[in-house]
Amino acid sequence: MTIDEMMSAIKGMTVIELSELVKALEKEFGVSAAVAVAAPTAGGAAAAAAVEEKTEFNVILKDVGANKINVIKAVRELTSLGLKEAKDMVEAAPKAVKENVSKEEADAAKKALEAAGATVEIK
């Protein structure tokens, strides 16, 4: 497979498929795709600006509530996990369901999970 063929295959993937690809590459090669954060040289002002400009949010499942099955279904729809993985995630609450997503996506996930009966927090 040439580099051009690989690029074409990657361009055709969904965001979830790309996320799974990154996780598989991290696991296979024992590396992390996390970006190294350099210490701010401007002091506290740079850190304060970063807090104000938060663009990525985590959706945390705090409590399942009485409708565990509905919450598992909602988690499966949001993450495209299999039944067992979604069930394990729900039973491990509090647990991050979605990480580093936009405000809009975080709000949509929160609404879907709350509609299923879960208690959700966005961080």
From Swiss-Prot:
Matches recorded under InterPro entries: Ribosomal_bL12, Ribosomal_bL12_C, Ribosomal_bL12_C/ClpS-like, Ribosomal_bL12_oligo, Ribosomal_bL12_oligo_N_sf
Ribonucleoprotein in keyword set: yes
SUPFAM superfamilies assigned: ClpS-like, Ribosomal protein L7/12, oligomerisation (N-terminal) domain
One cellular component term from this protein's GO annotations in UniProt: cytosolic large ribosomal subunit
GO biological process: translation
Keyword annotations from UniProtKB, A to Z: Ribonucleoprotein, Ribosomal protein
Keyword Ribonucleoprotein: yes
Pfam families: Ribosomal_L12, Ribosomal_L12_N
Coiled-coil ranges from the UniProt annotation: none
Gene Ontology MF, one: structural constituent of ribosome
Protein purpose: Forms part of the ribosomal stalk which helps the ribosome interact with GTP-bound translation factors. Is thus essential for accurate translation.
Similarity annotation: Belongs to the bacterial ribosomal protein bL12 family.
Assembly description: Homodimer. Part of the ribosomal stalk of the 50S ribosomal subunit. Forms a multimeric L10(L12)X complex, where L10 forms an elongated spine to which 2 to 4 L12 dimers bind in a sequential fashion. Binds GTP-bound translation factors.
Entry protein name: Large ribosomal subunit protein bL12
Lineage: Bacteria, Bacillati, Chloroflexota, Dehalococcoidia, Dehalococcoidales
